[in-house]
């Protein structure tokens, strides 16, 4: 029977069945059974035919037949498998039915199967349409209802089978549960941290004895992750466990506990920790670039184990993208995390970034942004949801308005933390009918709070929910922070607004912004000790192994803030601190060489911590520590960094110490004023007077200049050797009383003393303080203080002899006094006769007797007045005879022992010169200093006698000479070195003539003798060497000698300005002939400069200021930048030239000078903060007109202004 005939028969049978009158489901099932029987008969016939065909192949190999069967089983199912009416027949001929395919070709099999499946599907669709068409024609409504009920109601047999399957599953699971026949679990105590190590040792020991006569009887060892101090051992008996752990010191053999059978399953059960995330809750990231950043949960997808977070993006705005990308940008690697900042699409477009829009979102580099925030999916295990407490600063960044922040603070859930209320708290009702009702908490029971109202009409306690209350504080309350970042701090509440409070800390005197619920009324003051009790407030700690130290300025719950030696605050954990430092006995010298140490009171006079305006007071504080040239000072008036200042010793001055008036001996090269005269070792006091307030002890005034004092061999150049502080042993050990200052009235014993300061150990206090010597008096003395220097001087002969009215000082010829006016007619210094300074005459010269330095004369002169005094014997200083070379400087008449040594005709002079180049020189004697060639005389002069003496003089004019000159002086005077002071310049000089041009005439020196009123002034050639000493003070109107401690010329090897070194920028020649444009001030001479320390602090930096970049990458240095934002000590600027953003530090910015028409802002001075438009400039003065008030126009120094970026 063919397949077409069978199909037609089946269709005919189907039509016949559907046309029956009963139309019941039973007949439909019978028709299906008949159809299945026919198909089965057809398959038997085809099977019999196949059997006949297979008789010829009976001799084939059995192995080949089995392999074919296996291949048939592995083939894809045929189309017949998809037919619902196909039934299985008996299994007798199952092996034969598998060989229905003609060939084993896979392609042929697939093609045949596809054709059969398509034909079968067409037949099913046709039959289904026919059944749906005629199914309900002859059925009543009840029959149709019954049909659908039977079709869709549940099958009881199916549910029965499901119950049986579940029961089998339960039985199979229960079979794995431990029973009494299984080994037990035993708990063994273990040393903390060695659980895994012990398990490994047990395994090795078990393997070692496995094949011996006594193997271990334990089955397994279990170590649970996170469970410290115990392990589990599986064994039948406790004795088996004890024998296995014998010899392990890390295990406790005497405490072995068995786990109950019912609890054994829970021991090894692994519970997946899924955080309970809620929409809008705050979380933190554990890893990625956003580690420790705060985020808000936006969507939770538990199925895919991820969560969508809203957070502040970290986008690198400096990286060029797209078409603007260069070869250098291709190798660009992000070295640091970008700053968190809201997404700025304009900046991204400027660097070449491409942004697309997806609804409300902006898509950039695969990330979605909305309203500046980043929305991104993260794995759930990458976030931390427990214990997240955002700070107020972080909450402000996430809130789009102040109302959102207020709402966030007010609706902060109390369920996440413990009940913040305790009995005794003052609370206020924030919601409900009793809003704003205040009272006192009586008891707390879970989330219920019993409050006693403070109203007179309400005398009964009220029970309220905790979330309906909030703590109430008023200004002036003393509170303690019980949670949060500032936990443990105490302070005074200075302001309360909504749910936040401003607390003034007791330790650092700084304002803390905390939430009200984190506060609690407290009468105690914090001890300033951290939670571990290891460090204390204001402790000096070592930060690293390089010697960097710092002072603790803030204590937090888990961190410390340390102010290091460089003035930078580091926030570190206590574990990062190496050790505490003990430098209580360290001492340093302040700017006046006073010794300061811990607990001394000092004043800050320089550096970044000095006063910013002249009207302000200098900061005063107590020395906390002195360490390696760094002093930590605590000032109560400073709130920054807890009042701790980092200063250098030279920026401080000891309070109560007398300022030293003497100028330390420095060389010309180190002089702060290049026009000053060369300095003497005695600071210009030659000889030194006892009325200068200083002891002559240790003084070099009036002594013979030391060997090498001119910078030659043995010279000191003003080093510490000459400034050494000497101790006064006469006062040590005496009882003194403080008569002045803050410690007035205290008694003590002197432990150490110098010329200016004494160290007094107080009797009433266990401390030693430094006191000015003038403020203490020895007990038992009658009103005599322990003045500077204490006892007598070393030498009485070092002072200027005082024996008549012509001496200085003395009445009659004192300076100033009548007849000694300065200036007076003729520019005399002082007036003629006995008022000259220093006066000359008998014994009145400076130094006395012949005005020689060192003074000497003939053998019959008074030897006691010489400085130093000497006679004709070896007591001279240094002693010398008339012909030996021991003079100071030693020289003979013709030898080269002079200083500088030279011969009479050679070029070894300093500097070398010929006979006509002495300065100031006359005649042809070979001992003038300094000297150089004739073309550069200072001042120039002819070789006539008395023509170029310094100062110039003539017997015909009553012009005083300094030092005094006598025509009949010994010849040694005329042969002495060059005289001082200068040529023609009277002291103090004034000229009645108006013309003072610094021109030079060759016979200028001669004209002085002929006409003292000559107005010509000499000019000078540049010295041939930088160490040539010029004639001091020419045309500079020098002051009265001695008033400014004028040193002996030539001493300490003065350096000619302009020859390099420290004063290379001062190009004025010497002698000075007028100001040059490149001198001390700028060209305009009046532009005010902003201190560098003020610029480095960054307090002047505001948005839209135009600045210049320095100390950065080469392509950015010197470029203009516009300030966009200031965050966490960093400045975010925009570079118009590079069209990119840049992050810099405060000290990398300098303000730009505005031009007329620019917007400007005053950043320093009394008008700081004033802004407007720069209307005009007149030199250094700028006229700035305020944009708010057009009538407000101010004239401000241009050096105090900075250009502002204009939006228009």
UniProtKB/Swiss-Prot annotation:
Chain positions covered by the region annotation Interaction with RNA polymerase II: 317-421
Comp. bias regions, Basic residues: 65-75
Localization annotation: Nucleus
Record's keyword terms, sorted: Activator, Nucleus, Phosphoprotein, Repeat, Repressor, Transcription, Transcription regulation
Domain KOW: 420-447, 473-506, 595-629, 730-763
Coiled-coil regions listed in the entry: none
Record PTM: Phosphorylated. Phosphorylation by P-TEFb alleviates transcriptional pausing.
Protein name: Transcription elongation factor SPT5
Organism field: Caenorhabditis elegans
The gene coding this protein: spt-5
């Amino acid at each position: 029977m063919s397949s077409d005939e069978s199909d037609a028969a089946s269709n005919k049978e189907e039509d016949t069945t559907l046309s029956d009158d009963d139309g019941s489901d039973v007949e439909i099932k019978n028709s299906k059974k008949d159809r299945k029987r026919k198909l089965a008969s057809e398959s038997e016939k085809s099977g019999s035919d196949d059997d006949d065909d297979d008789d010829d192949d009976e001799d084939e190999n059995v192995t080949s037949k089995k392999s074919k069967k296996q291949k048939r089983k592995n083939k894809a199912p045929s189309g017949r498998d998809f037919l619902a009416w196909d039934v299985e027949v008996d299994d007798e001929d199952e092996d034969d039915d598998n060989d229905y395919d003609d060939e084993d070709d896979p392609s042929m099999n697939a093609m045949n199967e596809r054709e059969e499946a398509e034909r079968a599907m067409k037949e099913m669709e046709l039959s289904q349409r026919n059944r749906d068409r005629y199914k309900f024609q002859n059925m009543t409504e009840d029959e149709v209802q019954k049909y659908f009920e039977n079709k869709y109601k549940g099958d009881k047999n199916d549910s029965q089978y499901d119950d049986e399957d579940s029961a089998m599953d339960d039985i199979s699971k229960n079979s794995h549960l431990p029973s009494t026949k299984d080994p037990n679990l035993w708990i063994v105590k273990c040393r903390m941290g060695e659980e895994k190590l012990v398990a490994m040792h047990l395994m090795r020991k078990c393997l070692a004895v496995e094949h011996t006569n006594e193997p271990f009887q334990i089955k397994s060892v279990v170590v649970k992750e996170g469970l410290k101090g115990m392990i589990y051992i599986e064994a039948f008996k406790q004795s088996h466990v004890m024998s296995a752990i014998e010899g392990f010191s890390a295990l406790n053999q005497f405490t072995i506990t068995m786990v109950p059978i019912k609890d054994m399953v829970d021991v090894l059960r692994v519970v997946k920790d899924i955080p309970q995330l809620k929409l809008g809750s705050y979380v933190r990231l554990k890893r990625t670039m956003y580690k420790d950043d705060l985020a808000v949960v936006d969507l939770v997808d538990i199925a895919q184990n991820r969560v969508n977070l809203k957070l502040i993006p970290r986008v690198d705005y400096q990286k060029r993208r797209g078409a603007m990308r260069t070869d250098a940008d291709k190798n660009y690697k992000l070295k640091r995390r970008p700053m968190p900042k809201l997404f700025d699409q304009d900046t991204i477009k400027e660097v070449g970034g491409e942004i697309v829009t997806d609804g409300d979102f902006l898509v950039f580099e695969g990330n979605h942004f909305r309203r500046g925030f980043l929305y991104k999916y993260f794995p759930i295990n990458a976030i931390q949801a427990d214990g997240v407490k955002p700070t107020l600063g972080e909450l402000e960044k996430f809130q789009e308005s102040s109302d959102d922040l207020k709402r966030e603070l007010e609706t902060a859930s109390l369920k996440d933390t413990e009940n913040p209320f305790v009995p005794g708290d003052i609370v206020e009702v924030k919601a409900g009918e009793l809003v704003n009702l205040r009272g006192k908490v009586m008891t707390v029971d879970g989330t219920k709070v019993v409050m006693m109202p403070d109203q007179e009409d309400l005398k009964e306690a009220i029970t309220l929910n905790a979330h309906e209350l909030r703590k109430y504080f008023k200004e002036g309350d003393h509170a303690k922070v019980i949670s949060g970042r500032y936990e443990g701090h105490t302070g005074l509440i200075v302001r309360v607004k909504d749910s936040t409070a401003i607390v003034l800390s007791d330790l650092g005197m700084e304002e803390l912004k905390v939430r009200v619920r984190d506060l609690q009324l407290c009468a105690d003051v914090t001890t300033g000790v951290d939670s571990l009790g290891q460090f204390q407030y204001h402790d000096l700690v070592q930060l690293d192994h390089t010697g960097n130290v710092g002072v603790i300025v803030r204590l937090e719950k888990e961190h410390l803030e340390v102010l290091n030696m460089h003035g930078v605050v580091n926030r570190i954990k206590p574990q990062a601190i190496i050790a505490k430092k003990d430098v209580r006995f360290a001492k340093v010298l302040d700017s006046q060489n006073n010794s300061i140490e811990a607990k001394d009171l000092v004043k800050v006079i320089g550096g970044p911590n000095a006063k910013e305006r002249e009207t302000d007071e200098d900061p005063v504080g107590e020395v906390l520590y002195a360490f390696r040239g760094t002093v930590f000072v605590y000032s109560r008036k400073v709130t920054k960094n807890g009042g701790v200042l980092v200063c250098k010793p030279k920026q401080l001055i000891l309070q109560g110490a007398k300022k030293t008036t003497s100028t330390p001996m420095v060389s010309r090269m180190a002089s702060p004023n290049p026009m000053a005269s060369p300095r003497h070792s005695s600071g210009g006091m030659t000889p030194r007077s006892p009325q200068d307030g200083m002891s002559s002890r240790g003084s070099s005034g009036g002594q013979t200049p030391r060997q090498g004092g001119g910078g030659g061999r043995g010279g000191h150049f003003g080093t510490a050797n000459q400034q050494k502080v000497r101790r006064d042993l006469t006062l040590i050990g005496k009882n003194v009383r403080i008569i002045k200052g803050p410690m007035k009235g205290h008694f003590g014993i002197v432990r150490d003393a110098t010329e200016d300061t004494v160290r007094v150990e107080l009797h009433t206090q266990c401390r030693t303080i430094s006191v000015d010597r003038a403020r203490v008096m020895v007990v038992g003395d009658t009103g005599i203080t322990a003045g500077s220097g204490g006892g007598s001087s070393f030498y009485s002969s070092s002072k200027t002899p005082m024996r008549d009215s012509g001496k200085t000082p003395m009445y009659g010829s004192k300076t100033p006094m009548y007849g000694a006016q300065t200036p007076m007619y003729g520019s005399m210094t002082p007036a003629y006769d006995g008022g000259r300074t220093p006066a000359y005459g008998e014994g009145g010269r400076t130094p006395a007797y012949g005005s020689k330095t060192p003074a000497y004369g003939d053998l019959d002169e008074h030897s006691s007045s010489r400085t130093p005094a000497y006679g004709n014997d070896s007591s001279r200083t240094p002693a010398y005879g008339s012909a030996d070379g021991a003079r100071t400087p030693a020289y003979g008449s013709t030898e080269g022992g002079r200083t500088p040594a030279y011969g009479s005709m050679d070029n070894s002079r300093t500097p070398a010169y010929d006979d006509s180049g002495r300065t100031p020189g006359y005649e042809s004697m070979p001992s003038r200093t300094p000297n150089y060639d004739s073309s550069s005389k200072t001042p120039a002069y002819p070789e006539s006698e008395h023509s170029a003496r310094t100062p110039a003089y003539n017997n015909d004019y009553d012009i005083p000479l300094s030092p005094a000159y006598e025509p009949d002086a010994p010849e040694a005077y005329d042969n002495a070195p060059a005289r001082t002071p200068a040529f023609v310049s009277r002291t103090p000089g004034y000229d009645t003539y108006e013309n003072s041009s610094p021109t030079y005439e060759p016979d200028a020196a001669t004209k002085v003798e002929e006409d003292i009123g000559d107005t010509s002034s000499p000019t000078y050639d540049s010295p041939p060497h930088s160490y040539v000493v010029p004639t001091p003070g020419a045309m500079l109107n020098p002051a009265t000698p001695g008033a400014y401690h004028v040193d002996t010329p030539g001493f300490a090897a003065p350096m000619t300005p302009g020859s390099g070194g420290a004063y290379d920028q001062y190009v004025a020649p010497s002698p000075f002939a007028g100001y040059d444009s490149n001198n001390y001030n700028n060209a305009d001479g009046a532009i005010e400069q902003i201190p560098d320390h003020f610029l480095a602090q960054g307090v002047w930096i505001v948005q839209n200021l135009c600045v210049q970049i320095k100390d950065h990458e080469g392509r950015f240095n010197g470029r203009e930048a516009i300030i966009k934002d200031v965050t966490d000590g960093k400045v975010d600027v925009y570079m118009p030239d590079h069209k990119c953003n840049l992050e810099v530090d405060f000290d990398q910015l300098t303000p730009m000078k505005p031009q007329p028409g620019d917007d400007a802002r005053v950043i320093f001075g009394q008008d700081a903060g004033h802004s407007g438009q720069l209307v005009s400039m007149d030199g250094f003065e700028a006229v700035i007109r305020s944009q708010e008030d057009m009538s407000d126009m101010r004239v401000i120094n241009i050096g105090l202004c900075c250009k502002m970026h204009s939006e228009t």
